[in-house]
From Swiss-Prot:
NCBIfam families: pth. This is Peptidyl-tRNA hydrolase. It is an enzyme of class 3 (hydrolase). Monomer. It comes from Shewanella woodyi (strain ATCC 51908 / MS32). Hydrolyzes ribosome-free peptidyl-tRNAs (with 1 or more amino acids incorporated), which drop off the ribosome during protein synthesis, or as a result of ribosome stalling. Catalyzes the release of premature peptidyl moieties from peptidyl-tRNA molecules trapped in stalled 50S ribosomal subunits, and thus maintains levels of free tRNAs and 50S ribosomes. Gene3D superfamilies: Peptidyl-tRNA hydrolase. The active site is at H22.
Length: 194
């Protein structure tokens, strides 16, 4: 049974960024909310879109920060502080350059790997890196100088379909996480390739 009380999907706000690779974490939270029959609503107190869902009897908050990516910690910190949620009770879904589209993995702890959203969340949690992550593969452009344009661009059709397929599997694996445990959820998700 999971101890997670807050699930966060990282994104940049606005229509301009809605369909960009950098928003893959938000796509996961949007799909999770849809499956749970919840509606994400703007809440200025938490600087984001929020919903409250029940996953296998557990009360869980969903959050998509409406700050820009590099200020995600403002939103996560506000909600974690208000509800007294510890770092190891948080799951942050984010785009991952070092994995191909169609692959996603759960992970506990670690650094930010250059991801500005994770960097700001770590800072907002008093440098506590001990939160769970859902890393959603978006692939790498091959050239480090192209990363910014790449993550802020839209994936071509086949890559987008693979990302959406693995997000669907990540939502199913999240249900396993809450119904059973992280090890079983990891085994299921890590074996999947869209």
């Amino acid at each position: 049974m999971s101890n997670i009380k807050l699930i966060v999907g990282l994104a940049n706000p606005g229509e301009k960024y809605a369909q960009t690779r950098h928003n893959a974490g938000a796509w996961y939270v949007q799909e999770l909310a849809r499956v749970c029959g919840a509606t994400l609503v703007a809440d200025s107190k938490y600087f984001g879109l929020t919903a409250r869902v029940t996953l296998h009897g557990k009360d869980v908050r969903l959050l998509i920060p409406s700050t820009f990516m590099n200020l995600s910690g403002k939103s996560v910190g506000a909600m974690a502080n208000f509800f007294r949620i510890e770092a190891d009770e948080i799951l942050v879904a984010h785009d991952e350059l070092d994995m191909e589209p169609g692959v996603a993995k759960f992970k506990l702890g670690g650094g930010h790997g250059g991801h500005n959203g994770l960097k700001d969340i770590i800072a907002s949690l008093a440098n506590n890196k001990g939160f769970y992550r859902l890393r959603i593969g978006i692939g790498h452009p091959g050239d480090k100088s192209q990363v910014s344009n790449y993550v802020l661009g839209k994936a071509p059709g086949t890559e987008q379909a693979a990302i959406e397929d693995v997000i669907d599997e990540a939502v199913r694996s999240t249900e396993v996480l809450f119904n059973q445990d992280m090890a079983k959820a990891m085994n299921r998700l890590h074996a999947y390739k869209a």
